[in-house]
Amino acid sequence: MAYLESAVVIYLRAMYGIENLLRDINFQPDAYTFIEIGREAATIIMLVTLSLISGNNWSKKIGYFFLSFGIWDIFYYIWLYVCIQWPKSLFEWDVLFLIPLPWWGPVIAPILVSVVLIFIGLLLIYDFKFKISSFDWIIFCLSIFMILYTFMDDSIKILLSGNGSLTEVRPTNFNWIIFLLSIIVWVVVTLKVSIPSIKQRGKSQN
């Protein structure tokens, strides 16, 4: 799936003559724009379907989704680099998604998210029981929300201000402080709720 994703993006770059995303990309809606949005939705549906048939309970189904999404996203960039030697840098800007708004971020940002998703996915797949409180859930969900916000920050600002069009969105800067703090909180909460189960699993095996 990662190779197919990268192949489609390579074709789109060639078709639109895109060498520099910030300079060359055109978000003016056309038939291909809606096809691309449909392709993004279809990719998520495929990952969800794979997860639903892989896990024998909801915890594992979610785990397989996190795992497959993380691996897919990382190998998407690996295949892009193998095929067209892009990105030149892990800090190069990329359009991550168009649903529900255009997402922008340095390449390393979604890769970091994918690494965390793989870690959480493995914990769920191997049936570690999370002892999570309501407060932990709130902090966990808030950290995810803030990560998503950093990706859609510019799109949200244009949408709320009413000045300009989403088709004109170009990233101005990436809020590394909010992003990294959210990643750290996400990891800390995950460790906090999973370490007791990991320790218990270790004791039972000794």
Which residues are covered by each model-predicted region?
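Transmembrane alpha-helix/helix-exit interface in multi-pass inner-membrane proteins
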Residues: 2-13, 70-89
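Perimembrane loop-to-helix junctions flanking transmembrane segments
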Residues: 16-32
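Membrane-interface interhelical connector segments
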Residues: 21, 82-101
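Membrane-interface loop-to-helix entry segments
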Residues: 27-49, 98-119, 171-180
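Hydrophobic core of alpha-helical transmembrane segments in multi-pass integral membrane proteins
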Residues: 44-50, 112-124, 140-155, 176-193
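Interfacial segments of alpha-helical transmembrane regions
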Residues: 55-71, 131-142
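Juxtamembrane "helix-exit" motif on the non-cytosolic side of transmembrane helices
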Residues: 85-86, 125-127, 152-164
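Membrane-interface capping segments at transmembrane-helix boundaries
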Residues: 125-131, 189-205
